[in-house]
C-alpha cells in the first residue's frame, strides 16, 4: 500500500499552501519534511530530488513532483476534483489561474519591506475587490449552482476559498459586497475534510510572522 504523500518545503504557507489545502479537502493524510537551513535545500538539490532546483516538492505515488500547478493538477485528477470532461477542466484551469494571479500578490505580502507594506496592501484590496472577487461572484450568479464548475467541488473552489481566507486576514471586510463568495466559503468550510483542516492544530499554516519570514529568507536567499 502506498505511503502518505510527503511534502518538502519550509514551515510556512508560500507555494505549498494550495497543495496542503487540496490534499486536506480530498481527505488525504500527508507528512511534511520541513527545510530549516540552506543545507537542507542543498541536500535535496544535490541528490537529484528537485528537477528545477526548487521547491515545493511532493513525493507521491513513487514520483518526486515539482512545480505547484503540476502537483495540484495531479492531486485534483487522482481525487476527482478536476471536472468530468475537457470543457469543465478548461474552466477549472481558467478559474484557478485567476486565483493564482491574486495569490501571487497575497503570498508576497509578508516579505514586503515595511515601508512598502501600505502600498502592497492597497494593491491587494484593489485587485481583490475590483477585479477578482467580482469575476468569481459573477460566475456563481450566472449559473446559480453551489460550486464554480459542474455543481461539484473542484480544485478551483478549494483554491479560491483558501485565498478568500488569506485576503480576509489582511482585509477583514473584503467579502462584504460578495454574498455568493461568502456562501461558497461557508459551504466549502463546512465540508468535513475542510472543517477538520481549519481546526487549530492542523497542518494549515498561519499567516507568516516575522520569525517565519526570517527563516524563509535564510533558506532561500
Swiss-Prot record:
Top-level taxon of the source organism: Eukaryota
EC number: 2.5.1.18
Protein name: Glutathione S-transferase alpha-3
Taxonomic lineage: Eukaryota, Metazoa, Chordata, Craniata, Vertebrata
Limits of the GST N-terminal domain: 3-83
Annotated PANTHER family: GLUTATHIONE S-TRANSFERASE, GLUTATHIONE S-TRANSFERASE A1
Keywords (A to Z) from UniProt: Cytoplasm, Lipid metabolism, Transferase
Gene: Gsta3
Chain positions with N6-succinyllysine modification: 4
Biological processes per GO annotation: glutathione metabolic process; lipid metabolic process; xenobiotic catabolic process; xenobiotic metabolic process
Single GO cellular component term: cytosol
Location of the protein in the cell: Cytoplasm
Catalyzed reactions per annotation: RX + glutathione = an S-substituted glutathione + a halide anion + H(+); androst-5-ene-3,17-dione = androst-4-ene-3,17-dione; pregn-5-ene-3,20-dione = progesterone
Annotated function: Conjugation of reduced glutathione to a wide number of exogenous and endogenous hydrophobic electrophiles. Catalyzes isomerization reactions that contribute to the biosynthesis of steroid hormones. Efficiently catalyze obligatory double-bond isomerizations of delta(5)-androstene-3,17-dione and delta(5)-pregnene-3,20-dione, precursors to testosterone and progesterone, respectively. Has substantial activity toward aflatoxin B1-8,9-epoxide.
Subunit structure: Heterodimer of YC1 and YC2.
Family classification: Belongs to the GST superfamily. Alpha family.
Source organism: Rattus norvegicus (Rat)
Domain GST C-terminal: 85-207
Top class in the EC scheme: transferase
Gene Ontology molecular function terms on file: glutathione binding; glutathione transferase activity
Tagged with keyword Lipid metabolism: yes
Entry binding sites for glutathione: 9, 45, 54-55, 67-68
